[in-house]
């Protein structure tokens, strides 16, 4: 009853594309129906309380199944969920329903959520990014080029004062941002409050010297939501422009709370995706990163890491650009060659700046400006701090390379 090939999808339905690998002997339709049932109203037996509700109104439906080209016994199952199954404005509830129990299902050898279509009616219940791309540019007064960042290394072990010094050196050399590593929270060698104070000092000093607005992603991620908010409040009191959160390890509920605070208080929010590969690396099980990226845009963040296409981490170019567009643009056409399974209309929800980071350095600059365009943050960790003359010359090298590439592109040269 959950496999309904003649179903016409509604504009308000949440649509999901699952890559299903059934156990031997299980027909694909059966597997698709099982996914739809288990992630909506079904249970393993018929219960008398089914008669007290309208299953037709509330059940998920598998409405299309297609074999995956070049893979044996793998199918894409399309499932439509009625909007009423989900709590408004809760990414947490959306995921609990769609990817909750069903991934441990016996009839399936493996299951991967490839894409979600978020209908405008549901998207409108989310605040989305605290500020978005345009507001960020206006706050920073930086236009017509990608922004430059750098993660402070060594990520663990520096004292707060030396950490602030490293931040200052990078920023005075010409970077726009520096970043706490995702593992930097509040450890014995550097407590968060000390770090925040020294970094704020570095920011204002670099700003005064260069005449440009500078930021450092102060990581507010913590063991409890209360502690996280305390750090965010302290950052606001210091007058810094941006803070940071690890949204997968911190959780969507915490992230959404933080995003609301950031919008109310004029803070930009940088999002790191630590733990994403646990979920998205396997080709036939888990969740594709484009789903995690869409979820982040709904939950709220102004920057998110997306890999590089050229550095040390995995990522295919077309597919990466597919979810980069899903983060930045308002309306994205379905395009299977880029992994976009559904046309997505974000109805004016602010966009998220993609952050390219991971093993990139100055030689990659032409490729990066070409691939990511102006609306991006290019983040060079070792690619700045690894400069033989130090942080500031490393920062200068990156800024000069970026300005040169942008100028060449604007003159119509091929990078």
Curated annotation (Swiss-Prot):
Highest taxon, organism lineage? Eukaryota
Give the matching CDD domains: RuBisCO_large_I (cd08212)
Protein localization? Plastid, Chloroplast
Q: Does the keyword Transferase apply?
A: no
- UniProt EC number: 4.1.1.39
Q: Which InterPro entries match?
A: RuBisCO, RuBisCo_large_chain_AS, RuBisCO_lsu_C, RuBisCO_lsu_C_sf, RuBisCO_lsu_fd_N, RuBisCO_lsu_N_sf, RuBisCO_lsuI
Give the active-site positions. 153, 272
Q: Does the keyword DNA repair apply?
A: no
**Could you tell me what reaction this enzyme catalyses?**
2 (2R)-3-phosphoglycerate + 2 H(+) = D-ribulose 1,5-bisphosphate + CO2 + H2O; D-ribulose 1,5-bisphosphate + O2 = 2-phosphoglycolate + (2R)-3-phosphoglycerate + 2 H(+)
Which UniProt key words apply to this protein?
Calvin cycle, Carbon dioxide fixation, Chloroplast, Disulfide bond, Lyase, Magnesium, Metal-binding, Monooxygenase, Oxidoreductase, Photorespiration, Photosynthesis, Plastid
Function field: RuBisCO catalyzes two reactions: the carboxylation of D-ribulose 1,5-bisphosphate, the primary event in carbon dioxide fixation, as well as the oxidative fragmentation of the pentose substrate in the photorespiration process. Both reactions occur simultaneously and in competition at the same active site.
* Description of how the protein assembles with itself and partners: Heterohexadecamer of 8 large chains and 8 small chains; disulfide-linked. The disulfide link is formed within the large subunit homodimers.
Record's protein name: Ribulose bisphosphate carboxylase large chain
């Amino acid at each position: 009853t959950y496999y309904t090939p003649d179903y016409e999808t509604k504009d308000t339905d949440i649509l999901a594309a699952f890559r299903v690998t059934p156990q031997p002997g299980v027909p694909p339709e059966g597997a698709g129906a099982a996914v739809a049932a288990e992630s909506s109203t079904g249970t393993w037996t018929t219960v008398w309380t089914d008669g007290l509700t309208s299953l037709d109104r509330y059940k998920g439906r598998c409405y299309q199944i297609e074999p995956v080209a070049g893979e044996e016994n793998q199918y894409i199952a399309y499932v439509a969920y009625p909007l009423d199954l989900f709590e408004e404005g809760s990414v947490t509830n959306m995921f609990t329903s769609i990817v909750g129990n069903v991934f441990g299902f016996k009839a399936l050898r493996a299951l991967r959520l490839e894409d979600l279509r978020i209908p405008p009616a549901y998207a409108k219940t989310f605040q989305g990014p605290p500020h978005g791309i345009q507001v960020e540019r206006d706050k920073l007064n930086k236009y017509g080029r990608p922004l430059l960042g750098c993660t402070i290394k060594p990520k663990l072990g520096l004292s707060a004062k030396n950490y602030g010094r490293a931040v200052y050196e990078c920023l005075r050399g010409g970077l726009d941002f520096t970043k706490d590593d995702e593992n930097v929270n509040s450890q014995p060698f550097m407590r968060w409050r000390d770090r925040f104070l020294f970094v704020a000092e570095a920011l204002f000093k670099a700003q005064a010297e260069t005449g440009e607005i500078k930021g450092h992603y102060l990581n507010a991620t913590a063991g409890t939501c209360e502690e996280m908010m305390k750090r965010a409040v302290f950052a606001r009191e210091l007058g810094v422009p941006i803070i940071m959160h690890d949204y997968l390890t911190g959780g969507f509920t915490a992230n959404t709370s933080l995003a609301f605070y950031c919008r109310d208080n004029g803070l930009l929010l940088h999002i790191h995706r630590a733990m994403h590969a646990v979920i998205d690396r396997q080709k036939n099980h888990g969740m594709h990163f484009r789903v995690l990226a869409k979820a982040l845009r709904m939950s709220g963040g102004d920057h998110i890491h997306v890999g590089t296409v050229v550095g040390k981490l995995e990522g295919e170019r077309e597919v990466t650009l597919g979810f980069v567009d899903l983060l930045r643009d308002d309306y994205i056409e379905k395009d299977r060659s880029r992994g976009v399974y559904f046309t997505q209309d974000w109805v004016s929800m602010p966009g998220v700046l993609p952050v390219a980071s991971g093993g990139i350095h100055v030689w990659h600059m032409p490729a990066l400006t070409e691939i990511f365009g102006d609306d991006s943050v290019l983040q060079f960790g070792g690619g700045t701090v690894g400069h033989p003359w130090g942080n500031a010359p490393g920062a200068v090298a990156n800024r000069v390379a970026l300005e040169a590439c942008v100028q060449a592109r604007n003159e119509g040269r091929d990078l």
